[in-house]
Amino acid sequence: MRILYVGSVYFSRVMLEKLIDLNAHIVGVITKKESAFNTDFEDLAPLAQSNNIPYRYVRDINEGMTIGWIEELRPDIIFCFGWSFLLKKEIL
């Protein structure tokens, strides 16, 4: 199963680590570079990078370039943990 992972808080990192430990097929990670909104903010890019998983920093997950990248990844499922914005139907 091809997994796209979306998150930017502590719980997001913990769950991503668990999926990596289980050798899940993670095809991409979407995270934020910074967040003043979340006190438990976590940048998932270093974890993705150290495990050779493609990643993207986004401000607006629903913008065209991000949707295009998601389509290229062809995920079977999206795991979204700790993301403070709604995903539009084009992503789902």
Where are these regions (language model features)?
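One-carbon transfer enzymes
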Residues: 1-92
